[in-house]
Amino acid sequence: MAFLCAPGLTFFLTYSIFSAVLGMLQFGYNTGVINAPEKNIENFMKDVYKDRYGEDISEEFIQQLYSVAVSIFAIGGMLGGFSGGWMANRFGRKGGLLLNNVLGIAGACLMGFTKVSHSYEMLFLGRFIIGVNCGLNTSLVPMYISEIAPLNLRGGLGTVNQLAVTVGLLLSQVLGIEQILGTNEGWPILLGLAICPAILQLILLPVCPESPRYLLITKQWEEEARKALRRLRASGSVEEDIEEMRAEERAQQSESHISTMELICSPTLRPPLIIGIVMQLSQQFSGINAVFYYSTSLFMSSGLTEESAKFATIGIGAIMVVMTLVSIPLMDRTGRRTLHLYGLGGMFIFSIFITISFLIKEMIDWMSYLSVVATLGFVVFFAVGPGSIPWMITAELFSQGPRPSAMAIAVLVNWMANFVVGIGFPSMKTALENYTFLPFSVFLAIFWIFTYKKVPETKNKTFEEILALFRHNNGRSMLNCTNSLEPQSMNSGIEHAALMVSEEKTQHDSLFGTTSFSLTVEGMGPYPLSDSTNLLGPGSSSYGPGGVLGLAGSGSGLGGQCYTNYGTNLQTPQAARKCHYDEVDDYSFRRHSAHGRITQMKGKPLILGPTIKKDKKKERTDWLTASERFLEGGRSTHQGRSAASAPHHPRQPPPVCPSSGPXLRSASPPDSASVRSTSRAEEPHQPQQVHHQQQQVHHQQQHQSRYATHEYVHCSYEKEVVCDQANPSQAPPQQPAPPVQQHQQQPPPPLHHCQQRKHSHSPHHSRHTSPHSHHHHSHHSRHSRRSRRQGSGSLPGAHQGSANHSVMRPSICTSRRHRSVTDISTTNVCQDPACSDREVQEIMVRRTCCNTTATNSSSRTELAQCFAEDLYGSSRRPSSCCTSSDYCYQTDSTSLYGSRSSLSRNNSIKSASALVRKHHRSQRSLLPEHRHPSYTSISLRGLNASRPNSQLGSLTSIFDRAKNMAPEGSTLERQSSKGALGSSELPEYACSPSPIRWSFLADGRSPSEMEGAVGGGPEREQEEEDKLDAWQVPEPEPEKKPCRKITTSSSVYDEGPSTSAAAARKRRGSKGSRGSKGSGSYHCEFEDEATTTVMFHQDAGEAYNNCCSNNYNYIQCNTYLDQDLQITSEDIHQYLSKGDATASDILNNSKNYPFQPSNALEFQYKNNFQQGQANANNNNTNTTNTASSDAAECFQNYRAISKETNLNQTSTEQLSPTNINLSTSSNNINIVFSSSLERNANEVKFINNRSGASGGSEMGCEVGHHAGYLPYTYPSYDYTNMSGNSHFEKPLGIDELPKEFCGLEGAGGGGASTTSEHSSSLPSPQPLTHHQQLHHFESFDAASEHNLLAAQPMSPGSPLSGSVNPAGDDFVQMHHYHHANSPHSQSHHSHAHTHTHGHHVHHLLNHPAYDLTDDQFRLGSALKRVRKRARKYTDFLRKK
């Protein structure tokens, strides 16, 4: 009764389940109906045979005919069960059941008319057809019930399947007795009654809803899924179920259409498939079908009369029904695994009793009754466990994608075993006689052991949590995991900070694993930690000073100093951050790169070191001891397993320090800081004395290490690896010192210095930095002002407003948060040994990084093998996964799994990164200034092509469209998931589609005129030569001419690279003069010198839970864990075109791109990456040069003659202020509507107006980065099915401008020149006038009141937390509107960050150069047209 009153068990849910289980009742009825009339059917066959052939049939032949009648039912079941998966996907769960009833009616009619037709062949055919019907039922019904049942009732409702089977068995046995239909005249009616369940289901089932999971995940019909859930739950609040389904879809989207062969070959899905198969075999080979089919004859052979045997058979059916009812509440209370073990154990015992009763029945008369009791006990335990659990657990072990195929295979195996038992039991009974049940006893013992060892508990687990276990082990050996899937509660208080580590189980101890951390802070929710975070303080390492992860290479016995860290790099001391790998052998490298684990021990993070078999000890080091060791230079050594735990303030997070390990697996993408480092102001529990000691040590270290810096190497992303060597003018080259010596010379960086760099990238960061850090940073970075003025790299972290606040190149330390894009220009150019460089999350190792000696290709292949083993956790990984011509690197590609609730609970979130590859053809290409090619094409690499090719938005359809509309001469590439990683012969699991990985390829060109533009004399050239890749053969370089040294200025709040768009144009101008400092002609020469592959990897960090819980827009919440990674060519452009931008440019610092949630991605993106065309206006960097306008004009001319195509339109008409609307096909607002079957029904693309430059020498062409965007709003409602959203007002997110700008003419079209067009490379509009360029704005979200191009507060604990309000000071400080300034107006108007919003607007309106004309484009009217047309599309979708 408690189950009947359980929450969630509504009337309509009960009705739907009853209607569905009629199919299982059909299965039970036809299983037992052939048993009772056995003698009658045999007599009928004898009569037919005698009438045909005129002779009597032998007893052996009649037994064979009857066996065929019994077993052909199982043959049909095999066929139907195997077709169940296809039927479920093709017609749906409900649709398949309805169609299946046609077979049931046909089969029942054939059996019913068998005697009338005087043909036992019709009986065989009818049994076969009804077998197909029952096989489909056994596949579709459990699937349907498991998908409509709520989580808390799924086990009990799954048992209803077996209840219906037992009821069908009992009904067939009762009707088959001689007093009812068990006669010569009644048995055809008995068989024909199978038509009743089919007709009843045809009447009842149409009222029931389709499976919501099928509607939402498979068909992408969200509104229908919501309606079905509302009916089933009798409630309008179904968001929890919807979120669980979305989580399942996100976690398993790469397997959404997995075939049967893919299921069998998949290493991740093979273990649950084996479990499902064995569970089905445990049901059939337990011997239960022998009891069902031959119970009457079995009891008669035991000594019972025929009448008594029939009543005993009825008793078996009745006990089955009763025990199945009893097992329903036990299923969710005791658990599936436990009940199955009880059932198998009891059946084993009673099968022994049955065998004993057969042996001694002739000696003891009452032993015949013992056989009856033993048989009844056998049936009782079958009903408790193996009767219902195999059907249920098979559906639970698989997610939505592989579930149909898995159920088909399981049902096929079940029916095959059913057939074997049915056809073989008579012969086995004749051969074994009294030992008939002994083979079943052996099977029961085997199945019990397998269940105990291998089968997990699935009670109260979501489908994602169940599958997490198998993904966790990557399809290899499973341990006894009874409780491994239990939810792990994560306390929200910082005093109970815990780290979740998901380890890869490897086949030998030389393999590496992947880790993922999350820190749960009270009031903040899950907060992923970067792998570069040390929870234990500055002096403690994750494995102790000798562990590779904590202090890589500091232990004795290793030949090399620098080791690339794999796994958890909680804090990488100084020596560990050097990539000097030429003396370390592969074994040592792999041996010391093992896992680490961090567990929660009474609120203290306890760190368990790498597993070493011969050393099982655990050492715990106190915080202060670790700090002292840190200050002493980190010379302590430690071997074996070590740990460090540290008490800290209960309300403060432990101090963290970023690491520069070039090969980290992190919870954030490259150049991102996923953990907010605590500043000095936030550490009251830290003694001030420690700070001064650290500062003093750092100063000593800084001056001490100036001449030793060249000995160390930082491995960069790719062939952009730059040696960390001192300036040649300051130190002569030296030979590398011994590893231990190097480590002693280079103590780890102090805590506060790391903190300063962590906060030095954004204006928001600076307000968290203590004065001590500022002073020290100023003192530390006043050495290389010259390189900064030359623009020799984008160096975030500088304080440009003061002479003492310029940054030296070695101290670069960029930090970005999740979903930001990586700044290519700052890729690991840190020369300072104390610098934490950037947080590089790629895994990349070089043996001779910047070494002069060449390295053969075989060693690189070996390293590729190591990386492949680490990435996929298998020693069988071929090295071809990583090509020998490139560095072999990957990110954490462990699949995302877990529903949204489990992600919140377990924080089991994996991360990925943004990766960059460059194949340099010249030495100069290594320079940051040469990383801004003009890209001519972008193509999609389909690593996650889950949508069928026939659907709109699939990779095939988009690719075909791109080929048809691509300009002549453009490049389009498409690679398969295996070919993308270098081989088409790899096993499926080696380079299989990853659910967190989309990749884009971009073929680019670098302007030749940029060569030498950033020179600095012979010293600079010598430094560049030292940075040349050791594996590259230098090519003859063009003549290098010195260029003008540009000094830029900006606000005191600006922290970032000194190079700007204006400076870049000046350098180009000086280059155009061939070395002269005056302006000259600008040469628009483009030479194909570099090819760049840009790989964007989806990052799945803490922001999913945080942004959704803090009412941020749905798009970012949805796409954050959505495996269809939404990155357009616009984002790639932003990624690649910001090398010369300053740090306060929000696009380059911390913008979280609002990725477009659609697969309808454009490929062609023609020539949008202007050299050095970054956002100078954003930083108020107003430097002029007479060559600036020439440079911009040259680029405009180059772009004007280039062929540009919008793939979403057929017209190539250039955009102008007159056609920015939705009235024609040639517009720059792409609203892409696909069919209703498409997952993402529509999208709103970026709007970006290209404007030229004019104004002559009076006003330089200040090219704005991302200028000219029309404002748009990402809606907060469900974006995947617009017809399901009834509460929105502006459906496509096109919103008004702020009131101050709505009436401004020219505001929309008047953006300054931008480096990008529309994401699909729309043709450039005509250049606008000088007045039109004076004002442009960034994309402003009026609904959420923050700038979409700003840093979205993805985590409340980050320095960038809090929504940016355009009306407040924060918005003006970071996101004030920019406009071009003529020289005479610079003093009149200054973009100081202290301006308020109203003051800034007022000042803009009163700008002397601002003027309104009637013939200019009126943005307000355009927006009205946009919204009007958008609403029409939405209304159309609603009606559809």
From Swiss-Prot:
Residues 24-67, 117-127, 184-186, 294-310, 361-372, 427-429, 556-1440 are cytoplasmic. Keywords: Glycoprotein, Membrane, Signal, Sugar transport, Transmembrane, Transmembrane helix, Transport. The keyword Transport applies. The chain crosses the membrane at residues 68-88, 96-116, 128-148, 163-183, 187-207, 273-293, 311-331, 340-360, 373-393, 406-426, 430-450, 535-555. D-glucose binds at Q162, Q283, Q284, N289, W391. GO terms for cellular component: membrane. The keyword Glycoprotein applies. One of its GO terms (molecular function) is hexose transmembrane transporter activity. Residues 669-678 have a biased composition (Polar residues). Residues 1-23 form the signal peptide. GO terms for biological process: glucose homeostasis; monosaccharide transmembrane transport; positive regulation of peptide hormone secretion. Residues 754-789 have a biased composition (Basic residues). It is found in: Membrane. It is a multi-pass membrane protein. Residues 628-708, 725-808, 966-987, 1000-1083, 1304-1330, 1380-1401 are annotated as: Disordered. PANTHER family: GLUCOSE TRANSPORTER TYPE 1 (PTHR23503:SF128), SOLUTE CARRIER FAMILY 2 (PTHR23503). Belongs to the major facilitator superfamily. Sugar transporter (TC 2.A.1.1) family. Glucose transporter subfamily. Facilitative glucose transporter. This is Glucose transporter type 1. It comes from Drosophila melanogaster.
